[in-house]
């Protein structure tokens, strides 16, 4: 699932879970 995060998430995390929400979410 994705959790709120202030920092950018990794490209791999975005591809797997965060979709277009990389700015505020990360995979965990």
From Swiss-Prot:
The modification 4-carboxyglutamate is found at residues 13, 16. It comes from the Eukaryota. It is found in: Secreted. GO terms for cellular component: extracellular region. Keywords: Amidation, Disulfide bond, Gamma-carboxyglutamic acid, Hydroxylation, Ion channel impairing toxin, Knottin, Neurotoxin, Secreted, Toxin. The modification 4-hydroxyproline is found at residue 4. Disulfide bonds join 2-18, 9-22, 17-27. Belongs to the conotoxin O1 superfamily. This is Gamma-conotoxin-like de7a. It comes from Conasprella delessertii (Sozon's cone). The lineage of its organism: Eukaryota, Metazoa, Spiralia, Lophotrochozoa, Mollusca.
